[in-house]
Amino acid sequence: YNFLNDAGEVDGFEREVGDELCARAELTCEWVTNEWDSIIPNLTSGNYDTIIAGMSITDEREEVIDFSQNYFPPAASAYAAKSADADLKGGIVAAQTSTIQAGYVAESGATLLEFATYDETVAAVNNGEADAVFADKDALVPTVEESGGEMVFVGDDVPLGGGIGLGLRESDTELKAKFDTAIQSMKDDGSLNKLIIKWFGEGAKTF
């Protein structure tokens, strides 16, 4: 969804979407980066005004912050492992801390092994700490493809969450309305779908 390019700037799908939303909402926006595990507390405390970071809209997060309408459809999550017969129900499954996937694993009966970053969850499978990783399928596809057959998808895809939206403070109703209008206009004119396909390929889910 986003990454730092060689120049140290925020780049990727969300950079393009964010810049376009700010232009349509007539807002002057400055990009900052933050660690995932403190991203919501630092929003509520006022360090920045919105989160655009691949954050799924969930009931749990809605208790603390507000979300815009989604700018990315509910994505499939998936399991990947070193073998097709990995134990997903009774084994050890790695997931990123404080994600919708971690919550799902915790309730699935498997033993949840949490890591701060996606890369660490994959490493846990590769080094034998975990039997499988459970993550956004969009993130896992290139990982599995580039593993040279070392990693495979296991079981069925699992649709989770209400899609990805902008995280906002509950008090910022005016800002939320501006972003909602801008997102809707990008959905209506097809520009959002174009960006989804540009960054995630022809097979990606669109609006």
Where do the protein language model's features map onto the residues?
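Ligand-binding cleft/hinge of the Venus flytrap
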Residues: Y1-A7, G18-L27, Q96-Y118, V122, ...
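Extracytoplasmic small-molecule ligand-binding "clamshell" domains
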Residues: Y1-G54
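Short helix-initiation/N-cap motifs at beta->coil->alpha
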Residues: R15-E16, E30-N42, T97-T99, L113-N127, ...
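Extended ligand-binding regions for polar small-molecule ligands
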Residues: R15-R24, Q96-I100, G163-G203
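Alpha-to-beta junction loops
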Residues: E26-T28, T44-A53, N127-A135, A139, ...
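Periplasmic-binding protein-like
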Residues: F72-S77, K137, V141, E145-Q184, ...
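Flexible hinge/capping segments at coil-to-helix
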Residues: A76-A94
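Ligand-binding clefts/hinges and TM-proximal coupling segments of bilobed small-molecule sensing domains
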Residues: G103-E120, F153-V154, I183-F207
